[in-house]
Curated annotation (Swiss-Prot):
Domain HD: 72-222
NCBIfam families, alphabetized: dGTP_triPase, PRK03007.1
Region: Disordered, residue numbers: 1-35
Gene from which the chain derives: dgt
Positions with biased composition (Basic and acidic residues): 7-18
Name recorded for this polypeptide: Deoxyguanosinetriphosphate triphosphohydrolase-like protein
Organism of derivation: Mycolicibacterium smegmatis (strain ATCC 700084 / mc(2)155) (Mycobacterium smegmatis)
Swiss-Prot/TrEMBL GO biological process terms: dGTP catabolic process
GO MF annotations, alphabetized: dGTPase activity
Keywords for this protein: Hydrolase
Protein family (similarity comment): Belongs to the dGTPase family. Type 2 subfamily.
Length: 428
């Protein structure tokens, strides 16, 4: 393996759960070792079917809404790009953070967080459903790439550091925690793979690369959801300068983010309103000049939020290359408050729209009805990848997990096609 300036990662970080033989199809004399292990991992994520399916999964509005929709796939590409730039500034391996950005939503079901809510309702008695835990399950089990010695899938068989970089919430489900990273509590669960990835890691502490990915995710969707809202006419940035509107945003933000004070959120709204790049957007009208002003705004905000975290982290950790548990990412509260205000803009003017809420209710009903139909007719209703797992499952919880895995893998187009064709029978 060729050395790089990121050689502060060691063999433990680069270890794979299942040892792999050398490639056998290379021409004699061909150099097959010019990529790092993390570059290979990034390629595995980039080429996997689960990533491609994100093109037909909702980010905020549906993937078939408008001419230039943001989907879970385009969002993941944006997170990967922001994270990669931050990694370079922090001395983390950029391929490692890049792949974490690509994979961070790979477990999302149809209809994004709304679909996640529906599947969690269906599976609540058997471990629930959480997109981040589904990420881990896809990467370590469901996505076909490598088999272990017993013929069982090891998923993409990514390195330990790569899997950890995708893990925002490195803990199991508990009553106190709505978010979690691993499914456990049923036969043949994901606990052994989770234990292997987290071997020697501080309890409940995400690695630095995962923290960078998480902040890149926050930056991407806060800025770009607002951009999409402005283009659609649902958001007018001039509301930031309105005292009543700013107060409403601050109240929403304080309720959603208890670590942020109301007055800090109010001050953040004022700072945003006073930025020249915000004022330049004004009342967006779709002209070339307006589009350029909006694109400049998004570029400057992404840079502001990403660079603030790099600078603050460097002030604490110094200038050395950083990896895994060398440091935590330090994000100034001032910047966290600004990102929170942008999130609340999208929440108030897009996600809370009555028509949007009705669409979401219909989506959840559709998922519930498909789940009933698949369950009633399983294993015959399941894909060849999932039917044997259902037949081999030892109890209803494990069998339901297989049905959930199949639904989570659907694109929205396929889910709707299955829904139209279903012939549900009541459960016995």
């Amino acid at each position: 393996m060729n050395a790089t300036q990121y050689d502060h990662y060691d063999d433990f970080d680069r270890e794979r759960l299942v040892p792999e033989p050398a490639k056998s199809a290379a021409l004699p004399g061909t150099d097959t070792e010019h990529r790092t292990d993390f570059a290979r991992d990034r390629a595995r994520v980039l080429h996997c079917a689960a990533l491609r399916r994100l093109a037909d999964k909702t980010q905020v509005v549906g993937p078939r809404h408008g001419d230039n929709p943001r989907t879970r796939l385009t969002h993941s590409l944006e997170v990967a790009q922001i994270g990669r730039g931050m990694a370079i500034g922090l001395g983390c391996d950029p391929d490692l953070v890049d792949l974490a950005g690509l994979a961070h939503d790979i477990g999302h079901p149809p209809y994004g967080h709304n679909g996640e809510r529906a599947l969690n309702e269906i599976a609540k008695a058997f471990g629930g459903f959480e997109g981040n835990a589904q990420n881990f399950r896809i990467l370590t089990r469901l996505e076909p790439k490598v088999l272990d010695a017993d013929g069982r899938s090891a998923g993409l068989n990514l390195t330990r550091a790569s899997l950890d970089a995708v893990t925002k919430y490195p803990w199991r489900r508990t009553e106190e925690r709505r978010k979690f990273g691993f499914y456990v509590g049923f036969p043949d669960d994901d606990g052994p793979a989770a234990d292997w990835v987290r071997d020697g890691a501080p309890v409940d502490r995400p690695c630095l690369e995962a923290q960078v990915m998480d902040w890149a995710d926050d930056v991407a969707y806060s800025v770009h959801d607002v951009e999409d809202g402005v283009i659609s006419g649902r958001i007018d940035l001039r509301v930031l300068a309105d005292a009543d509107a700013a107060e409403s945003l601050a109240q929403l933000g304080a309720a959603a983010f208890p670590s942020l004070a109301h007055d800090d959120l109010l001050a953040a709204a004022q700072r945003l309103s006073e930025m020249p790049v915000v004022a330049a957007v004004g009342k967006y009208d779709g002209t070339l000049a307006a589009s350029v002003a909006l694109k400049r705004l998004t570029s400057e905000l992404v840079g502001r939020f990403a660079n603030a975290a790099i600078t603050e982290t460097r002030a604490v950790a110094g200038d050395r290359p950083l990896k895994r548990f060398d440091s935590d990412l330090v994000v100034p509260d001032l910047v966290r408050a600004e990102v929170a205000v942008l999130k609340m803009l999208a929440l108030q003017f897009i996600m809370s729209d009555h028509q949007h809420l009705q669409v979401q209710a219909d989506q959840r009903t559709r998922i519930h009805e498909v789940a009933l139909a698949l369950w009633a007719q399983a294993p015959g209703s399941l894909d060849p990848q999932f039917a044997p797992e259902f037949a081999a499952a030892g109890d209803d919880g494990a069998r339901l997990r297989v049905v959930i895995d199949q639904i989570a893998s659907y694109t929205e187009t396929r889910l709707e096609r299955v829904h139209e064709a279903r012939s549900p029978r009541p459960l016995e």
